Amino acid sequence: MPEKDEKEQHMRKPDWLKIKLNTNESYTGLKKMMREKKLHTVCEEARCPNIHECWAVRKTATFMILGDICTRGCRFCAVKTGLPTELDLQEPERVAESVETMGLKHVVITAVARDDLKDGGAAVFAETVRAVRRKNPFCTIEVLPSDMLGNESSLQTLMDARPNIMNHNIETVRRLTPKVRARAKYDRTLEFLRRAKEMHPDIPTKSSLMVGLGETKEEILETMDDLRANNVDILTIGQYLQPTKKHLKVIKYYHPDEFAELKEIAMQKGFSHCEAGPLVRSSYHADEQVNQAQVNMEARKAQGEQQRV
């Protein structure tokens, strides 16, 4: 029998991608609370490899709002796709209550793409930011929205809620974008990040890149340059892992030393912060990336509003 093409063979995960699961009481308690409050986390939906570290050790979580069904079907992502559910207008308060119960110092709020909504879900997204801040003035808030089809007024709605970090992922290099990302456009992502920075220059912007999909090193560096040209402050780089056999295959597993080199290059290119490693995901160690001066200002503002009520 002829040998299978190298890219078609099943690639065995290297040792550095094998992690020890930690399912202590903190982890199981958080999982129970999420179900009781009918909340979704991208940690579970996207099968993040860091879920046990974040939930059991760091006690952080990334909430996924606007339902758990995405209107897009990106070929790298494990989140369910199809016809989405109706908006849950009580969701912002439930997220805020959960953040308070967990005692979080930093929360990431992401969402499925809601291309069925005129504003892409921006109004509910913004209200979730405000609700979390009302109950948790010193909890820093990072948002990770879809591109909302490039709707500038939707972006303005979200930015005016004053998150502490605006995160929007480039995901892959320009050449691979049509293959990897459903309905998304490379240049629209760059424009989204540029406009966010123009609207509120003091709010750090952030993006994430997966590697292992067949990109070249030169393409990775070009993507870094494109992000910096649009004033993106923070970059995360992680290994793509195939969620199921229906998703894109892994072409290459990068060695930790290669990630260390990419991080060094990113810092030389002017990013204020870069996390790079095999298990790094967009929200990894996000609490270390905030602008503390902006955090304190937003907290004082929230406390003042509470006192006036």
Swiss-Prot record:
Source organism of this protein record: Shouchella clausii (strain KSM-K16) (Alkalihalobacillus clausii)
Co-factor(s): [4Fe-4S] cluster
Position of the signal peptide: none
An example Gene Ontology molecular-function term: metal ion binding
Subcellular location field: Cytoplasm
Family stated for the protein in its record: Belongs to the radical SAM superfamily. Lipoyl synthase family.
Sequence positions that bind [4Fe-4S] cluster 2: C70, C74, C77
Disulfide-linked positions: none
Source organism, top-level taxon: Bacteria
Pathway: Protein modification; protein lipoylation via endogenous pathway; protein N(6)-(lipoyl)lysine from octanoyl-[acyl-carrier-protein]
Pfam family, one: LIAS_N
Keywords: 4Fe-4S, Cytoplasm, Iron, Iron-sulfur, Metal-binding, S-adenosyl-L-methionine, Transferase
This enzyme's EC code(s): 2.8.1.8
Reactions catalysed, as given in the entry: [[Fe-S] cluster scaffold protein carrying a second [4Fe-4S](2+) cluster] + N(6)-octanoyl-L-lysyl-[protein] + 2 oxidized [2Fe-2S]-[ferredoxin] + 2 S-adenosyl-L-methionine + 4 H(+) = [[Fe-S] cluster scaffold protein] + N(6)-[(R)-dihydrolipoyl]-L-lysyl-[protein] + 4 Fe(3+) + 2 hydrogen sulfide + 2 5'-deoxyadenosine + 2 L-methionine + 2 reduced [2Fe-2S]-[ferredoxin]
Cofactor binding note: Binds 2 [4Fe-4S] clusters per subunit. One cluster is coordinated with 3 cysteines and an exchangeable S-adenosyl-L-methionine.
Enzyme class, UniProt record, top EC level: transferase
Keyword rRNA-binding appears in the UniProt entry: no
InterPro entries on file: Aldolase_TIM (IPR013785), Elp3/MiaA/NifB-like_rSAM (IPR006638), LIAS_N (IPR031691), Lipoyl_synth (IPR003698), rSAM (IPR007197)
NCBIfam families assigned: lipA, PRK05481.1, PRK12928.1
Name of the molecule in the record: Lipoyl synthase
Gene that encodes it: lipA
Main location: cytoplasm
One cellular component term from this protein's GO annotations in UniProt: cytoplasm
Residues annotated for [4Fe-4S] cluster 1 binding in this entry: C43, C48, C54, S283
